[in-house]
């Protein structure tokens, strides 16, 4: 029948698709642009903004993006992307050498984090929370370029790395049924 369990399951899957990252979404939110501090290249020793410290300190690190993204979720983000790569519960933000990798794809700078959330609460919840404080520290301590703007309409793509995994029942597992 048209109103059977299959239809209800399909409706539920469609309802969850935006938060699961399996479909593109549009809505108001934030754009956060992060870029390395001027003179922070690692090709020359001592080229960082603090000559007596690690030159990588003026560079955006994977952990910076991790902290910002995690706080966007905490603040109420409904969808998040980094440089156009939609994040899901299976996404990873990592370092590979000097490159930042998201969903196994290297990113170029600047790093643009886009997040969709409720306009009345989301921007303030992020700005007043740990993420807003962390961005201020990146700017003031490490001279990292930080720009946060509220957007009336953003479009985030569907994730290309979502895969469905499932389990099946195993019958007569040795030692489990008393045999």
Model-inferred region functions:
Residues 1-34, 40-42:
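Juxtamembrane "stalk/linker" segments
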